[in-house]
Amino acid sequence: MQDSQKSSPGWHGTTILTVRKGGKVVIGGDGQVSIGQTVIKSNAKKVRKLGRGDVIGGFAGATADAFTLFERLEAKLEQYPGQLTRAAVELAKDWRTDRYLRRLEAMMIVADKDVSLVLTGTGDVLEPEAGVMAIGSGGNYALAAARALLDTDKDAETIVRRSLDIAADICVYTNRNVTIESLATG
């Protein structure tokens, strides 16, 4: 476990994965919420549509913190309609400089028809290599599985589902109760 994960007992508790392939972008996440070594909830929805439904997102980290960030991102999307990258950069600036937001412990993956991004509390706004990125405690396992499946004939949703299953086989903080959201790409 990373040092940043030790500061909040709810930090380690999910896997979120995005894959962009074949005219579709998909974000999937498991439903497990753990505090320490105890599973508190197995069917949490950590992936959802944002804005006017033209952006999808998923979060890893403290749930209340993530919902605060989703609300802030939705406000930025209203301010910059159709400009996910601009909205994400503006949120990242606020996240990094605002005293209250700086303490929030969460990461987000967001995507629209054109771009997929990871947002972190350190002000990073990252676009994935090859259209694949993952966050959370099982993120590295899901990412490796998705990269291995990317060159197959499987579609984006199948890759996300299979990769999250593989992560659940390895990571004790990830389960198989998966939520998926997708959008057609431009």
UniProtKB/Swiss-Prot annotation:
It comes from the Bacteria. Its EC number is 3.4.25.2. Pfam families: Proteasome. Na(+) binds at A168, C171, T174. Disulfide bonds: none annotated. SUPFAM superfamilies: N-terminal nucleophile aminohydrolases (Ntn hydrolases) (SSF56235). GO terms for biological process: proteolysis involved in protein catabolic process. It is found in: Cytoplasm. GO terms for molecular function: metal ion binding; threonine-type endopeptidase activity. Allosterically activated by HslU binding. It catalyses: ATP-dependent cleavage of peptide bonds with broad specificity. Keywords: Allosteric enzyme, Cytoplasm, Hydrolase, Metal-binding, Protease, Sodium, Threonine protease. The active site is at T14. Gene3D superfamilies: Glutamine Phosphoribosylpyrophosphate, subunit 1, domain 1 (3.60.20.10). Belongs to the peptidase T1B family. HslV subfamily. PANTHER family: ATP-DEPENDENT PROTEASE SUBUNIT HSLV (PTHR32194:SF7), METALLOPROTEASE TLDD (PTHR32194). A double ring-shaped homohexamer of HslV is capped on each side by a ring-shaped HslU homohexamer. The assembly of the HslU/HslV complex is dependent on binding of ATP. This is ATP-dependent protease subunit HslV. It comes from Bradyrhizobium diazoefficiens (strain JCM 10833 / BCRC 13528 / IAM 13628 / NBRC 14792 / USDA 110). The lineage of its organism: Bacteria, Pseudomonadati, Pseudomonadota, Alphaproteobacteria, Hyphomicrobiales.
